[in-house]
């Protein structure tokens, strides 16, 4: 039994090769892999000993040879195949262990040149993977170090890998080469100025009970690249399996949390925040978020940007919640919530690096792609367009409200006071309708003065300003940009309201 080994990622390769050698396998390698294995004291054949042909073209041609591919592709159950191999002095190869040049990592470098990229396009590796994968009935193909242990275990127990394992590894190898080639194609098309073709690769991580509704089938997929503030890469510490709607809501909550560096907590329902608050510590942030809407939080999701403490966990415990998300959970907090068997607890990586990412939205027969809306301007006094300038307190409140309204379904209006939401108006077909909802919520809570209003889009008329003035709003932050901006400014001046234009819109559909 012979194994051809050539890996760029050398994780666990010495241990894997040693195990094969101890099981009586003959090892064949080239280049860096050959050096590493021989350096570990293993007896390994150089591929040149097999082909009788040297590496040429600076290593570009090493394994593209009939004595390699014939040994992989020849079917053991066909007499004519075996006779042809024998006539040409070709021995069979029963395993290929290959992973490829790091093309994706190379083109991710800011200073990468076309020459660097091209030299990291693997030719021999994909060819061997495809040959071995095609002949999976006779050949084991390994492209992932995570599979080393299983392969050794099966060979130890059975003398070879199991047929079903070889089929699975074959499928994995073809997936690996397909993704590799799609990455190269995407890069080369961009360099050539051709129309882009989009190649997406996501790994299925969970078959969901159902989708948005019980009659819809659904699966949860994860990007191969780990990112922060991600449900897909969270660690579940307790509770039931996540549902489709849970995942949608949790993702929306995490995008709000990432806006804040100070202690912050929010509650969310149906992808809209129902309560949010900042504070000097998590306890104050939680209290403000909860007090903002004690009713809507029922059956909702809570997310925070500080480790969950036992103190806050005790306050949460009596409330029916679907999910609690935090960067960490104090051991005592986990003990407090341990009796809530259905409550999903997600530990989420939260760093404040706003990695550029693409957002994909399916439409019937197509796909929309855009940059994630990770930008959010800091609110400053020089954005003021009215006669009255904002106080420091109003600036703080506007900054808070602006970060929240960005994540509310359009048309979106949020009113805030004292570092917490006082009312949220979401998803209405006209802006003044959303304003009425938010302002009435604040009024119902007894908050009727010193309010700050934030709008995700410009105010097309002065009616929202007029309405806001009747509910105790003293400051408004909006993008500006309407042909009737002057009407809104004039009305604000009449009412003594300070108003800021950010110059940036945050629609959310």
Residue spans of the language-model regions?
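ATP-dependent carboxylate/acyl-activation modules
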Residues: 1-5, 95, 180-184, 188-509
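Non-catalytic interaction/clamp surfaces of large macromolecular machines
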Residues: 145-146, 150-198
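Mobile "lid/hinge" segments at catalytic clefts and subdomain interfaces of large enzymes
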Residues: 128, 135-148
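Hydrophobic beta-strand scaffold residues
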Residues: 27, 44, 139-141, 345, ...
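N-terminal glycine-/serine-/threonine-rich phosphate-binding loop
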Residues: 1-50
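Short gly/pro/ser/thr-enriched loop/turn and capping motifs at secondary-structure boundaries
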Residues: 33-36, 51-57, 103-105, 127-130, ...
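Active-site/ligand-binding-proximal alpha/beta "capping" segment
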Residues: 76-126, 130-133, 383, 387-392
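Glycine-rich nucleotide/cofactor/substrate-binding loop typically near the N-terminus or early
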Residues: 32-103
């Amino acid at each position: 039994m012979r194994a051809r080994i050539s890996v760029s990622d050398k994780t666990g390769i010495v241990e894997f090769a040693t195990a094969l050698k101890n099981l009586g396998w003959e090892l064949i390698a080239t280049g860096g892999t050959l050096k590493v294995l021989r350096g570990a004291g293993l007896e390994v054949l150089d591929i040149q000993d097999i082909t009788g042909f040297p590496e040429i073209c600076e290593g570009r041609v090493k394994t593209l040879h009939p004595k390699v591919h014939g040994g992989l592709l020849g079917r053991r159950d066909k007499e004519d195949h075996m006779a042809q191999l024998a006539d040409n002095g070709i021995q069979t190869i029963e395993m290929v262990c290959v992973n490829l040049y790091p093309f994706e990592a190379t083109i991710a470098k800011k200073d990468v040149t076309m020459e660097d990229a091209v030299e990291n396009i693997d030719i021999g590796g994909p060819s061997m993977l495809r040959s071995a994968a095609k002949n999976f009935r006779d050949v084991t193909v390994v492209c992932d170090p995570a599979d080393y242990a299983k392969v050794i275990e099966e060979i130890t127990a059975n003398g070879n890998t199991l047929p079903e394992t070889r089929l699975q590894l074959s499928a994995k190898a073809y997936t690996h080469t397909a993704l590799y080639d799609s990455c190269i194609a995407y890069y080369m098309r961009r360099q050539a100025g051709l129309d882009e073709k989009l190649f997406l690769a996501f790994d299925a991580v969970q078959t969901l009970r159902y989708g948005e509704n019980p009659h819809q089938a659904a699966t949860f997929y994860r990007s191969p690249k780990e990112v922060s503030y991600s449900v897909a890469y969270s660690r579940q510490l307790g509770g039931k399996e996540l549902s489709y709607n849970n995942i949608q809501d949790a993702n929306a909550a995490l995008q709000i949390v990432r806006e804040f560096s100070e202690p912050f907590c929010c509650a969310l329902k149906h992808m809209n925040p129902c309560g949010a608050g900042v504070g000097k510590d998590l306890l104050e942030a939680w209290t403000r978020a909860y007090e903002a809407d004690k009713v809507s939080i029922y059956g909702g999701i809570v997310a925070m940007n500080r480790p969950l403490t036992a103190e806050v966990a005790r306050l949460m415990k009596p409330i029916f919640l679907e999910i609690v998300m935090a960067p960490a959970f104090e051991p005592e907090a986990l003990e407090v919530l341990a009796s809530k068997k259905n409550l999903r607890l997600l530990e989420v990586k939260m760093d404040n690096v706003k990695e550029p990412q693409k957002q994909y939205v399916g439409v019937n027969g197509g796909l929309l792609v855009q940059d994630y809306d990770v930008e959010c301007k800091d609110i400053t006094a020089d954005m003021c367009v009215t006669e009255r300038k904002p106080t420091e307190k109003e600036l703080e409140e506007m900054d808070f409200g602006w970060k929240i309204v960005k994540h509310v379904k359009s048309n979106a209006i949020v009113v805030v006071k004292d570092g917490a939401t006082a009312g949220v108006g979401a998803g209405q077909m006209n802006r003044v309708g959303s304003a009425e909802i938010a302002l009435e919520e604040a009024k119902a809570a007894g908050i009727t003065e010193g309010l700050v209003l934030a709008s995700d889009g410009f105010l097309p008329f002065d009616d929202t300003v007029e309405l806001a003035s009747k509910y105790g709003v003293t400051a408004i932050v909006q993008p500006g940009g309407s042909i009737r901006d002057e009407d809104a400014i004039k009305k604000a001046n009449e009412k003594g309201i300070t108003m800021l234009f950010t110059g940036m819109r945050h629609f959310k559909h």
